[in-house]
């Protein structure tokens, strides 16, 4: 079985490295030539377009930045939809909203009869590399059962959440909402402690000994204090996801005040070219600057 991966960003890179490590036949298409050369040296087959990759893959995992990029690799002239491989299963890991995922799945089915599974994941590049993602899948159940063993290569948990494409994307956005708000709470706690004359490292040590600790406080806290914003998830992509959350809340006529405020803060932080390509936890630096004026 050949697994194609489209997208060589941070998450895609982690997935590819994991599959190569397990001895899987991996086909790769992406835009970063340096990464493509690296993967080729590791044993992956590199393709110049998505169509050719799709022709020679049994399953494709798509992992691109946004809805526009997803439509491009699916529907452009040399996109996946131009291939003749009618047995193809597409597992899309891109963070899009439920309507966008449903749009792609319907168009894929109507044009080619391919199977399209909405497959967003929780976890970052290191989790992917260790096979510790959490995969959330919605779409045709029989197709999910066919590829579950592939998802288990990169995941510690795989959840099938329903026949309707897009359901898993709604869960993903609701989960990512927690990332934004928890990171803001952690940032404000650090700032309050610091400006009260308390060593932020002491504050964080105590926090992480309580039930208030989170994966974010344990993984990111000390990096934030050191102003180390090496990205596992870009600030600009966090803002993109928050925008999707707010779009969903408006469609559902929901009032999400914390998410709305998060959107304002992350958007303001993202106005800095220097910050937008740093880790999302750089929101701490932004808030600290506001409190140092």
Task: Say what each PLM segment does.
Residues 1-63, 83, 94, 125, ...:
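NAD(P)+-binding Rossmann beta1-loop-alpha1 motif at the extreme N-terminus of oxidoreductases
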Residues 15-16, 104, 150, 192:
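Hydrophobic residues within alpha-helices
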Residues 26, 46, 115-116, 158, ...:
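Hydrophobic beta-strand scaffold residues
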Residues 50, 54-55, 59, 67-133:
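Rossmann-like NAD(P)(H) cofactor-binding subdomain of soluble oxidoreductases
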Residues 96-176:
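Rossmann-fold dinucleotide-binding core
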Residues 165-286:
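Helical "substrate-binding/catalytic lid" subdomain
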């Amino acid at each position: 079985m050949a697994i194609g991966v489209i997208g060589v960003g941070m998450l895609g890179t982690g997935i590819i490295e994991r599959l190569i490590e397990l001895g899987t036949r991996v086909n790769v298409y992406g835009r970063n030539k340096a990464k493509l050369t690296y993967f080729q040296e590791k044993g992956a087959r590199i393709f110049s377009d998505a169509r050719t990759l799709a022709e020679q893959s049994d399953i494709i995992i798509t992992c691109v930045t946004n809805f526009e990029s997803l439509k491009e690799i699916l529907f452009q002239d040399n996109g996946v939809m131009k291939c003749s491989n009618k047995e193809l299963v597409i597992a899309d890991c891109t963070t899009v909203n439920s309507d966008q995922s449903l749009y792609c799945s319907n168009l894929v089915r109507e044009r080619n009869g391919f199977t399209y599974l909405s497959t967003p994941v929780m976890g970052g590049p290191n989790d992917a590399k260790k096979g510790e993602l959490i995969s959330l899948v919605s779409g045709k159940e029989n197709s999910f059962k066919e590829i579950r063993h592939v998802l288990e290569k990169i995941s510690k948990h795989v959840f099938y959440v329903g026949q309707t494409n897009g359901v898993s994307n709604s869960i993903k956005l609701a989960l990512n909402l927690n990332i934004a708000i928890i990171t803001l709470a952690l940032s404000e706690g650090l700032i309050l402690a610091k400006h009260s004359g308390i060593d932020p490292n002491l504050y964080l040590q105590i926090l992480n000994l309580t039930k208030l600790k989170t994966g974010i406080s344990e993984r990111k806290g000390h990096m934030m204090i050191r102003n180390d914003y090496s990205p596992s998830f870009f600030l600009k992509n966090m803002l993109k996801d928050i925008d999707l959350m707010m779009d969903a809340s408006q469609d559902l006529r929901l009032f999400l005040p914390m998410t709305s405020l998060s959107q304002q803060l992350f958007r303001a932080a993202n106005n800095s070219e220097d910050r937008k390509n740093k880790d999302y936890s750089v929101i701490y630096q932004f808030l600290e600057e506001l409190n140092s004026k």
